[in-house]
Amino acid sequence: MHKVEHGVSCAGCPHRAAYIACKEALGRGKNKVICGNAGCSATGYMHPAATTCTGGEEALLPRYKKEVPNGGTVDQPAVEACIHFALDTEVAADDAPRHFAGLAAEGAITILAVMVSSRAFLGAEAIEELCQHMVEDLRIDDVVAVDPLDTLACTDILRDMLERPGVHAVAFCSPCVQLQGDRAPEPVDIDRIACVGCHRCKQITGCPALVFAPPAYTVDADVCAGCDLCTSFCRTHVIYSPRVRIAPTERCEMRYQAATSHS
């Protein structure tokens, strides 16, 4: 298993996948903001955009470090749309109602993107209780639990939420790759003869398991955690997964089984 680096997302990190889905759904615009914390207890604080930056938080350019919008009110929110990342432990904390009291003033449409990946939330009951807590105590209009590594489904759900004013929440549920240990799914593979070296997989994901060895990419099998995220972004379809015929729901279950058995 790849050693954790401070400020850098691990290969297979579900927080990276969550950011990519949010970025794809939100699009660009100065009144559209992705902010908050997408790190973890091991990496420390990370701006969501840093999860796809090759050098992590330290290398992320200032123009990408969007801060939580302020100066708005419930009647006149600060921006048009805001996706505010937070860790499951932050949302479950006793001071969460105070900490997240300003969500409605951040954006006309605000989505609280909760990274549900820590050891305390490996069970369905714990996840359900967290979602209920968001509705009852944080005054969230609606909460949807999704698998961040099911990219297409995530993006569709986020786009639907971004059409509706108010405060919503998405619980991105997939266990931390470090909890899966050596039981993580098998790594992907790249056909180096067919790979055109376009860099798209690396530019979009920033995954440390993707290594450019001119003229093509290769996968560091000792680092890859078999999350399959990169397979969604290869235009020439030369990144091969052993799980190609397995449905996203089953892949998610495999990760949870690995995490619970390893823990």
Give the location of each predicted region.
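Structural signature of the thiamine diphosphate
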Residues: 137-183, 228
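Flexible loop/turn segments at secondary-structure boundaries
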Residues: 17-18, 41-45, 90-93, 118-122, ...
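Gly-rich Lys/Arg/Thr-decorated short loops/hinges at beta-loop-alpha junctions or inter-strand turns
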Residues: 1-6, 40-48, 79-80, 113-115, ...
